[in-house]
Amino acid sequence: MNFDKNISISDLAWVLVPYYGEKAEEKTFSDIKRHDRFTVSSKISQRNFLMIEKIFQDYLNDVEFIELSPLQPLGINCVLAGTNGKKNIPTIRGQEINSDATTALFLEAYRSLNSSEEIRLATNVRTIRPKIFDEKSKFLTHFKVFAEITIGRQASPFGEKEVFMIARHLMDEIAVLKLIRTKTKNNIVGFNVYISNLFFLKSMLLTITERKSQNDVIEAKRIWEESGLPAQLILNSNTVDELKTLGFNKGIRVLEMFLRALFSHVDFHNDANVNWFFDLSRSAGINYYRHIAYKITAVSNDNLELPLADGGSNDWGAKISNDKQFFTVSSGVGTELLIQNFLRLA
């Protein structure tokens, strides 16, 4: 179908809404009995989701939990997160279906920000993406995820408040996952936490004169593979010195501030079921997060390791306000992935 690309969304909707309305009225019972990958229901009981959500809400009792609209402004993820527009699902009326709960939470938080205090919002919501998964994985195009956002203003020293909130998101999510391991029947034997500073790979990307891929994630992965650098280091008080020995100097200050905040948590030092690493190989999220990012994986008793949580610092607040004093920290935990692969519930 050819149409004028300069046509407005409202004019396009004026054409498409009646067209789809007519098509809907032509459908039969046989047509609507058919399922596709977008309309098949989750196999997980809603009771199990509610049980897990209660653990999150009880622990995070100082965070406001909200119920997001399933529709968000068209382009929200392209504008804020740099997502390829083809990975979103638009509606014919000019919105897009919620595919990233953290960007939606960010807009809600930003609208409410009117003081120097941080705003923390969270939700457990079903999101949908058009990605095609291998049938063996049993992953659906729609899935539930816990998401959390914190926005606020920087204070002196610049960046310290921001990295403190990254550490808080991380330690809160570790604490909740440990509670879930304690309070439910599951096959989880432990957790691995991978800390990264994506500024390192971003800096290496800038030195490349001839790229083999225009995709920054792919190119950054190639750079790391050809660098001879280790994939991970054990995270401890010697990590910064080890990184300096490997030649990393730019971006060290923000990492030092983050590690001070992280190491100050008592729980960091006293849980044998949580292993900590610094991940030099991570390229995922290189244009999503500013610098510090983390990933939490769960390990089962048959050595299955799957990523459950991901978080870090974004530039969304600074970008939308044109004010570098704004910071944004976002994170998410795959609650559907957790229940499907690790929990043994009724």
Task: Describe every region a protein language model picked out.
Residues 1-10, 112-128, 210-213:
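Short charge-dense sequence patches
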Residues 1-45, 62-68, 72-78, 82-101:
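Auxiliary tRNA-acceptor-end handling modules of aminoacyl-tRNA synthetases
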Residues 1-8, 180, 196-200:
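General structural signal for secondary-structure boundaries
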Residues 43-73, 80, 90-186, 218-346:
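Positively charged, Gly/Ser-enriched RNA/tRNA-binding surfaces
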Residues 207-222:
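Short, low-complexity, polybasic intrinsically disordered segments
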